[in-house]
Amino acid sequence: MKNAELLTAPIGLFDSGVGGTTIWKEINALMPNENTLFLADNKNAPYGEKTKEEIIALCDANTQFLLNHNAKIIVVACNTGTTNAIAYLRDKYKQVPFIGIEPAIKPAGLQSITKKIGVLATRRTLTSDLFAKTSEHLKQEEKIEIIEQVGEGLVDLIEAGQMESAEMTALLQKYLQPMVAEGIDYLVLGCTHYPYLLPQIQRLIPTSIKVIDSGYAVARQTRNILVQYHLLNENQDYVATHKWVTNGNLEILKQFAAYKDEKKHSIEVLKI
């Protein structure tokens, strides 16, 4: 592609489902004139209970789809995908920069007063080498106690649009109360789906506990890399186009992809 075409090529994002839309919102807020292409692999969600080999294969297929549609940068908008597959992707696809997502345990740990933080994430994220390396450093060097909790079942309910269901509330109570009892003062949402549960989570924990995720940091890093590679579209008059693609439930993705400012943005939701 020519330089002008590269500038308007889309930022590619993929996730195991709709969770990565939380990352898309941060990227769009920071860079509203960038085209985007979001792939929701709903058919294979959740990734958190799959083997590392399965996750790598799915992330590889997602990457190929985005590259076939001329993505200029790829955001792995999935914690499980990042912690298990991003090293493989960067090694295989050296022609394109990748942005990954890790649970924000480092900033949480460094800001914690009680030196106790909670992490709610998928099983595969919590057992990954990347998470183990970061958490071990915090434990050894900063003397931070990390209380880990697998959010089993949460992604399935979010994908089904049941964020406010009684079943969701029961699961959140089950997962959050032990961490609260341990005296955490930070709760890290270690899955891009989980920010959609923020209202429910805040109702179930003391107001003194701060809840953080990686969304804004990922958007900022994406912008930094686009600048570094001279790929940032700085034309403030450019009207961006956003395309959303799923291999699963079209109606669910439409709910999460909804954007209010239709005059400035064109959103296309397709089923592949």
List each language-model region with its residue ranges:
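Non-catalytic structural scaffold of enzyme domains
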Residues: 1-272
